[in-house]
UniProtKB/Swiss-Prot annotation:
Pfam families: COX15-CtaA (PF02628). The gene is ctaA. Pathway: Porphyrin-containing compound metabolism; heme A biosynthesis; heme A from heme O: step 1/1. Residues 28-62, 113-121, 181-211, 265-271 are extracellular. Disulfide bonds join C35-C42, C189-C195. Its cofactor is heme b. This is Heme A synthase.
């Protein structure tokens, strides 16, 4: 059974990643109304008779979301039953399921009540939490923490501050990026790093949205760079923290490069999808570090208790 659960966890993680990228594809191609204002049916039909490209993209996104719902539900039930001895399993199972349901409801709301940029941005943010929760659940199932000896990990307050702070801030940056996409502001500023050669400062809403996201992205790049330097200097003996920050910096660098290329490739589809891919992976890695941070507090208490008993 455990072998089956491992395969299920991998397939579920991939399915949720496809859902995230599918949502970006729907937005990029303007396929949000490919099934009209009908949900869960498509144009009022179970199998739509008129299959335009927009309809195919939107319908495919709904089907992958539906399959993800089934897989996540099954994974939550089985992990709860067979891995309940692991402290975070129940919490992650609940988060995975609750945010998947919330994601589906937000998607339905976007279809029925209109493609409001704020609603669509929230839809992506909720999807990201569901994806990260399933990734963490998968890590627990594969016992990644044991391979890195994470159970003995103890971090100082400074490192935990950076982990929690960067993760929360990353989530806020995600919303600024989602707002850029849903406000159709990806090409509002044709140059980089300034908005335009003729007028470096933004002058209208779409330019402010674009430049606000750029400033937020630059700050998270600098913050992750600083945290990585701290990890390299002080956590070489803790490979999970050491490599966690290095991987985070690689991902945020790739994210930045792709973000710049979005501007210079006229917001090509490939760049837009890669932009969504890298931020999804970055957020998942940061969430894993958060989980390690919560464990560190427990490990520190246990170590202190053991030290008192030996004395």
């Amino acid at each position: 059974m455990q072998r089956f659960i491992k395969w299920l966890a991998v397939i579920t993680s991939l399915d949720l990643l496809i859902v995230l990228l599918g949502g970006a594809l729907v937005t990029k191609t303007g396929s949000g109304q490919g099934c009209g204002k009908s949900w869960p049916l498509c144009n009022g039909e179970f199998v739509p008779s008129n299959l335009s490209m927009e309809t195919i993209i939107e319908l495919s996104h709904r089907l992958t979301s539906g399959s993800a719902g089934i897989l996540v539900t099954l994974l939550c039930i089985l992990s709860w039953k067979y891995y309940k001895h692991v402290r975070e399993t129940k919490t992650l199972a609940i988060l995975s399921f609750v945010f998947l349901v919330a994601q589906a409801l937000m998607g339905a709301a976007a279809v029925v009540w209109g493609q409001m940029p704020a609603v669509l941005a929230i839809h992506f943010g909720i999807s990201l939490i569901s994806f990260a929760s399933v990734i963490l659940l998968t890590c627990l199932i594969f016992e990644i923490d044991q391979k890195f000896d994470a159970r003995s990990l103890i971090m100082d307050k400074k490192m935990k501050f950076h982990i929690y702070g960067v993760t929360i801030y990353c989530y806020l940056v995600v919303y600024t990026g989602a707002l850029v996409r849903h406000e159709r502001a990806s090409l509002a500023c044709p140059d980089f790093p300034l908005c335009s050669k003729n007028r470096p400062m933004p002058t209208q809403l779409h330019e402010w949205v674009q430049m606000g996201h750029r400033v937020a992205a630059m700050l998270i790049f600098a913050w992750i760079l600083y945290a990585m330097i701290l990890a390299i200097r002080h956590y070489k003996q803790q490979p999970v923290v050491y490599w966690g920050w290095i991987i985070s910096f690689i991902l945020v660098t790739l994210q930045a490069i792709v973000g710049i290329l979005v501007v210079f490739t006229n917001a090509s589809l490939a760049m837009a999808l890669l932009h969504s891919l890298f931020i999804s992976c970055l957020f998942a890695v940061l969430c894993y570090l958060v989980m390690l941070g919560t464990r560190s507090k427990v490990n520190a208490k246990e170590a202190a208790s053991t030290s008192k008993q030996t004395k």
